[in-house]
Amino acid sequence: MIISLTGGIGVGKSFVANCFQEFGAVVFDADSVVHQLYKVDKSIISYAEKNFPGVVVNGEIDRTVLSKYFLAYDENWKQFQSLVHSAVLRELEFFIAKEKKIDRKLLVLDVPLLLETKFYLYCDLIVFVHADSVVQAQRLNERNIDKEKLNLISDVQLSIEEKRKMSDFIIDTSVSKEYVFSQVKDIVDSLNLNT
């Protein structure tokens, strides 16, 4: 069973993924994969070096510097994102094949832009992760994501309502960690997925 997580930024998708791990799930964390690609993928690093001055430091992409180019969101950025998404897709396909070969029962995909990039096509179920706007704003503030960057991120994502409609389950992360865990447990129990 492959479950994917979707939702807005700062809603707690990574925490939900960690909860699924408590039930034996193996998580594909696309953010971690991207961070690794920024260190070792020569084509991505080369493209960044040519198109985003100052972004490559000591042979690796500096994510802080790179984030400044995101605000421009021009054709160079779109091409860069396409390169990154293609590399992540290769890693995802490898991950799924490897885990299926050893008969892993539960995989969880924690992938930003899951629906926008069609990564959801690899999944059996989609879980929409939601937090109320006050909690989400607090989390974004803790991550130093300002309103301008949030608006830009929102512009390239499907609307929250579209994500909700495409989902099989909804998890609310606004209340407490215990409540989130209980919702994950309910999903696992309903699907008879205890591994």
Curated annotation (Swiss-Prot):
HAMAP family the record matches: Dephospho_CoA_kinase
Lineage, highest ranks first: Bacteria, Pseudomonadati, Pseudomonadota, Alphaproteobacteria, Rickettsiales
Residue ranges occupied by any DPCK domain in the UniProt entry: 2-195
Binding-site list for ATP: 10-15
Keyword Transferase: yes
Gene3D superfamilies: P-loop containing nucleotide triphosphate hydrolases (3.40.50.300)
Any single GO CC term annotated in Swiss-Prot or TrEMBL for this entry: cytoplasm
Source species of the chain: Wolbachia pipientis wMel
Family according to the record: Belongs to the CoaE family.
Protein name: Dephospho-CoA kinase
InterPro entries: Depp_CoAkinase, P-loop_NTPase
Pathway as given in its UniProt record: Cofactor biosynthesis; coenzyme A biosynthesis; CoA from (R)-pantothenate: step 5/5
Catalytic activity: 3'-dephospho-CoA + ATP = ADP + CoA + H(+)
Cellular compartment(s): Cytoplasm
SUPFAM superfamilies recorded: P-loop containing nucleoside triphosphate hydrolases
The entry's keywords: ATP-binding, Coenzyme A biosynthesis, Cytoplasm, Kinase, Nucleotide-binding, Transferase
One GO process term, biological-process aspect: coenzyme A biosynthetic process
Gene Ontology molecular function: any one: ATP binding
Function text: Catalyzes the phosphorylation of the 3'-hydroxyl group of dephosphocoenzyme A to form coenzyme A.
